[in-house]
Structures are given as C-alpha cells and as structure tokens.
Amino acid sequence: MTAPAISVNLNKGQADMSKTSWIRSSGLGFAVLVGFAVPAGAGTLDSVKQRGTLQCGVSEGVAGFSEKDTQGDWRGFDVDFCRAVASAVLGDAGKVAFTPLSASQRFDALKGGKVDLLARNSTWTLGREAELGLAFAGITYHDGQGFLAKRALKADTALSLDKAKICVEAGTTTQLNLADFFKANSMTYEEKVYPSAAEAFAAFESGQCDVLTRDQSALHGDRLRLAKPAEAIVLPDVISKEPLGPVVRSDDFPWFTLVKWVNFALVNAEELGVSSTNVDEALKSQKPDVRRFIGAEGGFGKALGLEADWAVRAVKVGGNYAEIYERNLGTGSKLGIPRGLNQLWSMGGVLYAPPLR
C-alpha cells in the first residue's frame, strides 16, 4: 500500500545535528554513537582495519547506482565504489557491508557512526558540509534534476508542467530545486511529498501524481520499472546541478583524504589506460606516471596508511572509472545513459583528477 503524502518537519535535522554536536563536544566520541567499542583516539581507517569490514551506506534501491540483484547481491555504480575502497584498504572487495538508507536517514547514519562511508547518490552542497559536519570526497557522477511525466499529461518540456501534481522524496535537494524552478518561471504545482524514493515512485505509478522528479539518472531506471514504460517519458530538461559523490565525517581528515584519492585513482586509471584486464601488465611498465600509480615509486600508499599497491587493488576487481560506469549505467547496462559530462576532460567531459605525484 502506498503511504500517504506527508508534510516535512524541516527543523528535525537541525535538532539531530545539535544533539550530535553536543555529544562530540562533550568528549564522548563515536563509541557512544556507533554502538560498539572503538579504541580511544582511533580514526575511521583504524576502526575499519580492526573490524575487517567497511560499513558503506547506500540507497534503498536506485537502478544503476545501488540495488540488489535477483540473487540478493548488491550491484551498482555506488556499490562498486564502496568495493574499490574496501579493496584498497583491506585487500578484499568483498569485505564491505551495505546498509540501505533513505534520504532522511543517510546523513544522521553517517554522523552517528552507523556507516564509515556514504555512497548514496548524494548531492554535494554548501549547507551539507558547513552545517552538518560532513565532507564530500569529490564528485563521482555529474547529474541534474529531471522529470518523469505521464504521456497523458502531454508535456514535452519542464515548462509544460504548470499546475501539475508532482511526487517528490522528503529530505532532498530535489524539493528545494523544484520550488526554485517553479517560482522562477511563475508557475504553480501541487507537491506530494513521501518519506522514501520507493514510496514516491509507487505514488506516481498508482496515479496519485502526474510527474515524478529526482536526479535524471535515476528517472531512466524508474521508467523501466513501470508496468507500462511506454506510457511515461523522461523530459529533456535538467533544472539543477547535482554533483554526486561519496561522503564522510568532516572530523577525520586522513579518512577523507583516503576516500577522495580512491575516487581520483579510478579516474587516473582510465586516463593512464590501466584497467581490470591489463593491471597485471601495468606492473611491468616503466612509465613514471604508471609506476607511481602501481606504487613502485612515490611511497604514497604509506602516506595514506595503506599498502604500496592500494591503487592497483582498487582497480583490479571492479575496474577503472570507465569500466564501472559502462557496466552499471552505460552501454553495458539496461539504462544506456551516455557519459556526457562524465567523460574525461580530454574527451569533452568534465571528469578530472589531480595527479598522483
């Protein structure tokens, strides 16, 4: 049964944040929040190594990013990123536990220590870093907010949506962007707010609204999940910038640096031509930039608290950025989303990583 639309209490997150801040300032630390013993002064990296498992927060089910397959195994772009981090840190891509989180749960779960890393198609914003005590470890996917509309509405662009009933998930930048877009274009709409993406989708499918709005990448998967996909269309408009990326707590700079550089390593691997299929051959390379990548020169693994071959580990199982993208979102997936902005900067996109130097 589809949950009824609800009103959102915008002050709850502020109250939760205040409680978390008090606990931090009181010196109680993460041991209180996490629910298991953490040695005094231990950072996230030490905790992950001692536990032997990376705790990764993902979505409750977004096609191409994080969802369970028919065997119950987690698959997707964000899932593969978590596995790359686990492989770099623990030497085993399988040593990761996935925790599905709704949009309203995700940041509290991260702040409270329930997860070590959030890879849950989350948009990097000023407020989330400055107000919530979080840090985004780069951008893994350049997205934008779009609209999935019933063909019966006869809308061909977002400007055709005046007076439409629109389903949206609570606790997201999507709500804010929606209000800004309609106000800027002197249009009105009826907002139907739901506590999870799944409930917003169910409401759209059952006819409680004419339009579903969220990140455009997710809408392609939503359309395919409909009983009659041909009766809905993803409109071409993108009304916002949605830089999606992994998130960590802002009070652990070494862990932030590590996660950020695993992200960069996947991009650098694509630039260097290092992939899951040829990484063993790369170990024989005499090119200086490749030798730094494989850990033969530079000593960067030690600086991160990792083994010298940390970047090789990250790529060996799941592949470089291109392999991860194409398998989950691009030509090798059911979604078939063109890379667009997510192409390398040298190929017409904006994907760029600092050098391993």
What are the residue ranges of the model-derived segments?
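Short helix-initiation/N-cap motifs at beta->coil->alpha
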Residues: V96-D108, E191-S206
